[in-house]
Structure formats: C-alpha cells, structure tokens
Swiss-Prot record:
It is an enzyme of class 3 (hydrolase). GO terms for biological process: proteolysis. The lineage of its organism: Bacteria, Pseudomonadati, Pseudomonadota, Gammaproteobacteria, Pseudomonadales. PANTHER family: ASPARTYL AMINOPEPTIDASE. Disulfide bonds: none annotated. Its cofactor is Zn(2+). One of its GO terms (molecular function) is aminopeptidase activity. This is Probable M18 family aminopeptidase 2. Coiled coil: none annotated. HAMAP family: Aminopeptidase_M18_2. It holds the Pfam family Peptidase_M18. Belongs to the peptidase M18 family. Keywords: Aminopeptidase, Hydrolase, Metal-binding, Metalloprotease, Protease, Zinc. Its EC number is 3.4.11.-.
C-alpha cells in the first residue's frame, strides 16, 4: 500500500504544476471512480448514495459522496486542503530584453523561499484565455520542457553572498528564456498562441490574457539511503489533496463525505474560490436548502483541515518548542494554537487522536514556540464561515515553501489510513 500510494503521489505531482492542473488531475481521478460533475449554473438533482463534484475557477474543487443516511442524523465528514503553492507568476506585460536576452517579469505568489529558485531548470504552465472564431475560450497549457532559468551571480562578483543575501524580486528574479538578436522583438502572447497550437492543435486568433506560473521541471523522487523521504515541489499542499482524495475513494461509508480543495490559501484565501469565499457554504446549502436542516447538519459535522506541518529540522531544532518537535515518518501532526491560528480544540483533537489510536497510526502534536509567530490554514476560516467543528492536522515536512520540499515516505500511508477511518466513522463527537 505504501509504495503504491507514494508512486501515485509522484505521478499526481508531475501532472499538477499549477492549481488549474491539480484540479484537472483531481477531476480525472474522480470521474474514473464514477463521480459526476455538477454545474453551479444549473439546478441540481442529487440522490442519496450519489457521487458528485463541483469546480470553481478551474482551480478549486469540492467532491461529495452523498450518504444513504441523512446528514441530519450523522452529519457530514469533511476534509479540507488547498491546491496552490508559492511560485513565480508571469506579469501581464512581461517581456524584458536586456543584454541580448529575452526575460519575463514575474510577481512572487505567496510566501516563497526565493533563493532555491536560482539555477533551476524551469518550465511554464497555467491557464490561457483567447479568442477563436469570435468566441472567448480558455485552455490549460504546460510547456513541460525546461525553457527558462534564473542564473545566480558568480561569487566572484558577489563576495558577501554567503553572509546573507537580500533578493530583490523585481530585478533579480526575471528568468532568462532565450538569446535574441539586436533589434528582434519577441511577443510573449504570440509564443502562447504557438503553444496552444502545439499542445492542443487549436488555432487561436489572439491570446487575450493568462495566469501562468514557472515551476521546477525536476520530477518528484524517493530519496535517502533507505528511501525514507520524498523530495518534490508543491508538497504543500498537494500532499494533503492527494491523501484526501485517496481516503474519499476508499471510503465505503453510508455517511455523507466531502473533500474540498481550495485555491488561494497561500495569499489569504479571500477570493470567490478560496476558503474565505462562499464556495463550500453555497455548495452545502444547495444540498441542504432548508435553513434549519442546514444548521442542524453542520452542528453534527466535523472538518479535518489538512495542511503540512513543520518537521523538526536537525540543523535548526531550536526553532521548535522543545516538547513539540514533529518528526518525519512519525505520523500526522495535530496543530494547536490557543490564539485560534489553528481551529483545533480539545474535543476535535481528542477525536482525531482516538481515530489514530484505533487505526494504529502514530500521531504527534505541534505548537509554535511562545516567542514566535504562528502561521494559519483554511481551518479557522472554514470553521468561522460554517460554524463547523474543526481539527487542524498535517504531515511534517522540511523546507516548506521552497521550490523543492521534503516529507517522509511512510507518512502518506499514515494519513490516508486515518482519513479513510474518519470518512468511515459512524459517530462524530
């Protein structure tokens, strides 16, 4: 089971360089399992036992397995994650031609670690909107090949580079794509038109706009002397998306189960398809249109907010509270913050710990050092929007928000096992 899950994760990561591609990958797997698309613009006719999914903006998705039992009796079992990761996004008018090189201006998306982006073989992917035969259409593209690089400045020209380096994203991050002759001008949108023709065999009249991200072309890999680790881009938080998907597909429960994977978590979640938007609430209200029934069902429900946790790094162990240092390959982490940066409380933490014990899955706890600030997740946002009880958990990782992150190769199986048990659980606290 562990090897198959890890192989599936690596394949999923490769197919998902952007939130748009991640959502498409989730859709492909859900449809293969018999899930049917619900269009938000149409009226819905759902049936008990039905399997459905909803997307918004092509970058957020909610998968729903309606139970044979009413949510008024058993509640709804929800797992939440996010599809986006810190990266470099291409600007609207990006062309830069300096010193005979074609470069693209980029904007930093989210709280990225910038130094690891240098000297990487980069490609470009995302969504392109264009006009064809008088109609406006959109399509996903992925160059796949390494088409760009951000070369470092040689240490001979930057003698203090190893003493601390403040990266200027405006001047130092534009990737180099090609050399160009003297007065030659390159039109980036024309390049996108060519890519649409190559990848999808369609002839766009004009590219109108785009949302494109650079990404590292190095594939995810199982590494370490004993294969103890998975090194990959976008583990935060496609690791949790994939774990939630596998658990949902495994769940043969009579209860109603939901997986929600939102975009824009890394930039605050405040969007139409983000966790701070109305997507999940509107979807659940359409399934439970009576206001009284909706509140009753939500108060019987529970959300597991799954987002990676900071594993204790052997070189920087003092960055953790001495009693709360999550270890890689030691199971999922319950995240606690009394200032509500995480939504966990004693009842939801206790229930998750109970599930882990019943499934013989190791479980850990994390609380930030008292002299450091604490990050947050979609957990508190979802809890405050829905009024649903929530526990924040995640798998321990190193190098969070780097272009290449690291997690334990045993932990995915741990998380899938306990989330499957959660979906199958007959009673919630």
């Amino acid at each position: 089971m562990r090897d198959a899950l890890n192989a599936g994760l690596i394949e999923f990561l490769k197919a998902s360089p952007t939130p748009f591609h991640a959502t498409a990958s989730l859709v492909q797997r859900l449809e293969a399992a018999g899930y049917q698309r619900l269009d938000e613009r149409d009226s819905w006719a759902t049936v008990p036992g039905g399997r459905y999914y909803v997307t918004r903006n092509d970058s957020s998705i909610i998968a729903i397995k309606l139970g044979k039992l009413s949510p008024l009796l058993g509640g709804i079992r929800m797992v939440g994650a996010h599809t986006d990761s810190p990266c470099l996004r291409v600007k609207p008018q990006p062309e830069l031609q300096r010193q005979g090189f074609l470069q693209l201006g980029v904007e930093v998306y989210g709280g990225a670690l910038l130094a690891p982006w240098f000297d990487r073989d980069l490609s470009l992917a995302g969504r392109v909107t264009f006009r064809r035969d008088g109609k406006v259409e959109s399509q996903l593209i992925d160059f796949k090949l390494p088409i760009a690089v951000i070369p470092n400045l040689a240490i001979h020209l930057n003698r203090t580079a190893n003493e601390g380096w403040q990266i200027n994203p405006q001047t130092e991050l534009p990737p180099i794509l090609a050399q160009v002759a003297g007065d030659e001008r390159v039109d980036f949108r024309a390049l996108l038109t060519e890519q649409l023709a190559r990848e999808h065999d369609l002839n766009a009249d004009v590219v109108l706009d785009y949302e494109l991200s650079f990404y590292d072309t190095q594939d995810a890999a199982l590494i370490g002397l004993n294969g103890d680790f998975i090194a990959a881009a976008r583990l935060d938080n496609l690791l949790s998306c994939y774990a939630g998907l596998q658990a949902l597909l495994n769940a043969d429960s009579d209860e109603t189960c939901v997986l929600v994977c939102n975009d824009h978590e890394e930039v605050g979640s405040c969007s139409a398809c983000g966790a701070d938007g109305p997507m999940l609430e509107q979807t659940l209200q359409r399934l439970l249109p009576d206001g009284d029934d909706y509140v009753r069902a939500i108060q019987r429900s529970l959300m597991v907010s799954a987002d990676n946790a900071h594993g204790v790094h052997p070189n920087y162990a003092d960055k953790h509270d001495g009693n709360h240092g999550p270890k890689l390959n030691a199971g999922p982490v319950i995240k606690v913050n009394n200032n509500q940066r995480y939504a966990t409380n004693s009842e939801t933490a206790g229930f998750f710990r109970h599930l882990c014990m019943a499934e013989e899955v190791p479980v850990q706890s994390f609380v930030v050092r008292s002299d450091m600030g604490c990050g947050s997740t979609i957990g508190p946002i979802t809890a405050s929007h829905l009024g649903v009880r929530t526990v924040d958990i995640g798998l321990p990782t190193f190098a969070m928000h780097s272009i290449r992150e690291l997690c334990g190769s045993h932990d995915l199986a741990h998380l899938v096992k306990v989330l499957t048990a959660f979906y199958r659980s007959r009673e919630l606290p």
